[in-house]
Structure formats: C-alpha cells, structure tokens
Regions:
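Conserved anion/nucleotide-ligand pocket segment
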Residues: 160-189
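Structural detector of well-ordered beta-strand residues that form the stable sheet scaffold
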Residues: 112-113, 134, 153, 165
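Short active-site oxyanion
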Residues: 107-111, 127-132, 163
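Short, glycine-/small-residue-rich phosphate/pyrophosphate-handling segment
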Residues: 127-145
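Short, surface-exposed amphipathic charged segments that create phosphate/polyanion-binding patches used
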Residues: 64-66, 148, 167-168
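Extended, subdomain-level signal for the structured scaffold at the beginning of enzyme domains
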Residues: 1-112, 120-124, 141-144, 153-155, ...
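Crotonase-fold acyl-CoA enzyme core
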Residues: 149-150, 155-162
Length: 189
C-alpha cells in the first residue's frame, strides 16, 4: 500500500494594498495540486491559510477584501510562507510591526516565497541580505533600494535559492508557485 501524501500548509501574508493576482494566482496553483486516489477521490496536497497583523478583513489594492484567517502570532504551523506585492508595499516597508512579524513568519516556514514587490518587504528586514532574489521590473529601482545588500537578479522570472524563492511581477508568481509544488510534491502532481 502506498504511503498517504504529505499535506503541506501555505500561509499567505496579507497587508493593506496587496495585489489580488499576487495572492490568488499562486493560491490557485497550490490549491490545484491534487492527487487522484485509487478509489476515484481527489486528495488536495496543500492547505491554504491567510495571515496578517491581526485576523479580519484586509483590503486589496484593487478593492476586494480578503479575510485574514489568523494573526501572524496565532497562525497554525505551515510549510510555505507566501508574501505578495502590491502598491501597499510602499507603506508596508515602514510598518515595523509587520516587518518583525514577517521575520518571525519566515523563520517558521521551510520555504519563504515572494511575488512582485513582496520581495521589498523581506529585503527591508535584512533576511535576504547576501542572497539572490528578483522582483517586479517596473518597480525595480524602488525595490532594490529596500535591500541594497541583496544579490538582485533583474532578468530572472523567479529565483530559487533553496528556502527562499522570489518571483518577478504578478503572473510570474504562478510559475514560481508551480515550481514549489513540483519540488514539494513531485512533477507528476
């Protein structure tokens, strides 16, 4: 009998002004990773939770609100942390409690991922210093100012540095998430 699949948990960090596609593109990639069982049923391989400074509604940059399931401090254990970008990052880089929460959240995760300008938030914390990373090309100059000691890779669609995987703008987050799915659950998924 085959061993049951390992169900992984993804924690999606939310903040005011996040970009909807930065969150829901990768979420769809993780949520679509499923395994067909011999009895015909389908087993999801990733569980998705949302986290923020405090649980409750978080308004995106495009307008729709997403509910944060947990405050960072109260989140259940997770394997992957996803940090989206968005115009809200311009204010969030100066939000010390959020940055401290992201440092702690990243330490809890086996893999920390960023989409678009989400890399600016982690760069601002210093946890990406000396590591290769990428980000949104339109906001490139602003992003690299947030972490001058990061080894920025401008041409990359995404950069996989083991426990840190960063992607460039918006839809590149889907490709990045699919690469993490393949790493954690195999190419056949």
């Amino acid at each position: 009998m085959a061993e049951p699949p390992v169900i992984r948990r993804v924690a999606v960090a939310l903040f005011e002004g996040f970009t909807v596609l930065d969150v829901y593109g990768p979420v769809q990639a993780f949520a679509s990773a499923r395994l067909a069982r011999p009895d015909g049923s389908i087993q999801r391989l990733f569980e998705i939770v949302t986290v923020a400074e405090k649980a409750g509604p978080i308004k995106s940059g495009e307008g729709p609100t997403t509910h944060a399931d947990h405050a960072f401090a109260d989140a259940p254990a997770y394997d992957v942390l996803l940090v989206p970008g968005g115009f809200g990052t311009r204010q969030a880089v100066n939000n010390a409690p959020l940055l401290l929460a992201l440092i702690a959240a990243s330490r809890r995760a086996a893999i920390t991922t960023t989409v678009c300008t989400g890399s600016a938030l982690l760069a601002r914390t210093g946890i990406m210093d000396g590591r290769p990373a990428t980000s949104n090309k339109v906001a490139w100059d602003w992003v690299v100012q947030q972490g001058p000691r990061v080894k920025w890779q401008r041409q990359a669609r995404w950069v996989d540095d083991g426990d840190l995987v960063t992607s460039s703008g918006v839809s590149a987050g889907i490709d990045m998430a699919l690469s993490v799915v393949a790493r954690l659950q195999g190419m056949d998924v």
